[in-house]
């Protein structure tokens, strides 16, 4: 069995990983820890050139990849087969593409609340994954966790 665990490096990420670890151990599953990084900007600001933007984006991607590696190291130390994947793009679409590519059996995601107005306009990651209807989705409630 394969679990795809979506993380965004916010405060509740540790809780989401703890739940994923318990699930992986009880199901004898491997874990793919996935973060969907921001897609390329549509335009470059007037004050910064493309090289500056590319350099900053590259630095952020390296930092995000290091964080993913730390998470997978922690899971491996707990006896879970874990790998890290950093993708770029719209979060829901990127996660669905990775679930397909990796042959995921279950997606684990946090229930980050953005507030009612933002959620009405933008929707939520968990809702988007559930609406896709192709994989079971475990939503970890994180409302009372510190961000």
Model-predicted regions and their roles:
Residues 131-142:
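Short, acidic/small-residue loops that bind anionic groups at enzyme active sites
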Residues 48-52, 101-103, 125-126:
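Short, hinge-like loop/turn segments at secondary-structure boundaries
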Residues 1-51:
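Small/aliphatic-rich secondary-structure junction motif
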């Amino acid at each position: 069995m394969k679990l795809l665990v979506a993380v965004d490096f916010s405060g509740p990420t540790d809780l989401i990983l703890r739940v994923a670890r318990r699930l992986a151990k009880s199901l004898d599953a491997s874990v793919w820890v996935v973060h969907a990084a921001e897609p390329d900007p549509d335009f470059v600001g007037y004050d910064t050139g493309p090289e500056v933007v590319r350099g900053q984006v590259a630095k952020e991607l390296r930092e995000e990849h290091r964080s993913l590696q730390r998470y997978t190291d922690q899971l491996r130390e707990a006896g879970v087969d874990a790998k890290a994947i950093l993708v770029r793009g719209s979060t829901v679409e990127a996660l669905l593409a990775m679930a397909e590519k990796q042959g995921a059996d279950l997606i684990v995601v946090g229930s980050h609340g953005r507030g009612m107005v933002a959620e009405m306009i933008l929707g939520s990651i968990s809702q988007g994954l559930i609406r896709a209807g192709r994989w079971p989705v475990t939503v970890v409630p994180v409302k009372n966790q510190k961000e």
